[in-house]
A protein has these predicted regions:
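Extended repeat-based interaction scaffolds and adjacent low-complexity, acidic/S/T/P-biased segments
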Residues: 1-85
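Catalytic "initiation/cleavage/transfer" segments centered on a nucleophilic residue
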Residues: 35-41, 48-74, 94-125, 197-287
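Signature for HUH/AEP ssDNA processing cores
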Residues: 116-176
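Structured loops at beta-to-helix junctions and adjacent beta-edge loops in soluble globular domains
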Residues: 135-137, 180, 268
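A short, flexible beta-alpha/helix-coil linker loop
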Residues: 139-143, 194-199
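"Short basic amphipathic alpha-helical interaction patches in structured regions
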Residues: 148-149, 192, 205-208
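Histidine-centered divalent-metal-coordination microenvironment in nucleic-acid enzymes
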Residues: 174-198
């Protein structure tokens, strides 16, 4: 695959939202539309589930008898459809998009509440817990070769390792993960791991070992961010808001900061980070 699937889907979504809000036809409307349609056709998979606005392009591919081999020819054929007609088509899918975003926000709120409940229970059960946070993604130079199927497969392997408590995951008492898609990071995962504090003490070291597993799973295409690097932690320590690392049950401030920090995994405000495509409708994005 030579197309950056993640970036293209975000570009298409932004394009549809822009056209929906336009008062008049943009100068290069048909050229831009034909280019995006051809590029989308190159990555389109009928088995996948596309989010909101992207469905407008799926329907254009299905319904219009158009030539997708040449951008110039396609642009000419698209001119048979008025700007207002296409804009009205987009309007229908933008409305569906907004409804799905509301559903997404509700689901994320539910996930947040469940995670906070789980972590509050864990913090009450043990005198101290080690909360480990890291983000897993792909190096930018490989974004063009990683699609949603690759991301889903890599995450399935990682989750199986976690579930089996294999290696560094031995002794886990809680964990959570959230799959997202961003303009800069592409497909990525926020990962939370929780251990008994009397058995593990080095959160930075654990995150580093997990990152090595991620690199192996992705054949060295993966990258990571260790949330326990001193530079990153210092800003929270200075503000008195540090909520990862060693958390003591008898320190209400630490527990409170921890419960706030873990909400970042599924924070509803990060709406632009949702997946625009899933390998199937039931593909999980949080657990």
């Amino acid at each position: 695959m030579n197309t950056n699937e993640s970036a293209l889907l975000i570009e298409i979504e932004n394009y549809i939202l822009e056209i929906y809000n336009r008062k008049s036809k943009p100068k290069d409307f048909y050229d831009d539309l034909s280019r995006l349609l051809i590029e989308f056709n190159g990555i389109y998979n009928s088995d996948y589930s596309y989010f909101g606005c992207i469905e407008a392009f799926v329907e254009l591919l299905r319904e219009l008898n158009i030539c997708l081999g040449c951008q110039g020819e396609l642009a000419q054929q698209l001119k048979n459809l008025s700007f207002k007609y296409i804009q009205c088509r987009f309007e229908f899918y933008v409305s569906r998009h907004k409804r799905k975003l509301r559903d997404h926000r509700y689901s994320e709120n539910e996930n947040t509440a469940q995670l906070v409940k789980r972590m509050r229970t864990v913090s009450q059960r043990y005198s101290r817990i080690l909360v480990v946070r890291l983000d897993l993604a792909y190096k930018k130079k490989y974004h063009h070769s990683v699609d949603i199927a690759d991301f889903d497969n890599d995450m399935r392997i990682l989750r199986q390792r976690i579930h089996n408590q294999d290696g560094i995951f031995k002794g886990l008492i809680e964990y959570a993960w959230a799959l997202e898609q961003g303009t800069e990071k592409g497909y990525h995962c926020h990962l939370l791991l929780v251990y008994k504090g009397h058995e593990h003490k080095n959160a930075y070291g654990i995150a580093e070992r997990v990152s090595e597993i991620w690199k192996k799973i992705t054949f060295n295409q993966g990258c990571y961010f260790n949330c326990h690097s001193p530079e990153y932690l210092n800003q929270f320590e200075e503000q008195g808001t540090l909520g990862i690392g060693m958390i003591h049950r008898n320190d209400p401030d630490q527990v409170g900061n921890m419960l706030k920090a873990i909400q970042y995994l599924v924070r509803p405000e990060k709406e632009e980070q949702y997946l625009r495509v899933k390998v199937c409708k039931r593909m999980r994005t949080f657990g």
